[in-house]
Amino acid sequence: MLRDFLFLYPIMQLKILKWLLQFFRSVNRKSKFISDKLKKEIYFYELEERDSDIYIVTFPKSGTTWMQLIVYHLLTDGNMDFKHIYDVSPWLSNQAFRGASPEAVNKLPSPRFFKSHDKYEQFNRGFNNKVIYVYREGKDVAASYFHHNKNY
């Protein structure tokens, strides 16, 4: 019943999440994991989704950045007017953990496209946005993860 109430009134859900974040920050340092999760949830609730949004959702080390560049080239006819791909295609979870405001992302021109390693269901809130899911063989992901962590 509470879940139905929160679903119907998202502004209440946002206020509850902000209160919980403040509560867990004041308890102790061991609650950092919980406060980080809440910070991310608040960021996603404050993000204004559009019908033209494109989400590139993958498991880590599965070619996410390559897919970002491919989508950018298709949308801009090969224009390379950016310093880093995150300038034109932000990584939403990374932005949330850094404490960045979603205002900059909300000001990006349509169609916007985002990188994420989260579940794609988190972004689909009844809009007609698009999701690109990149699948890569599990053995290749494990090998790539191993070499990434070894050299990190």
What is the predicted role of each segment?
Residues 2-152:
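PAPS-dependent sulfotransferase catalytic domain
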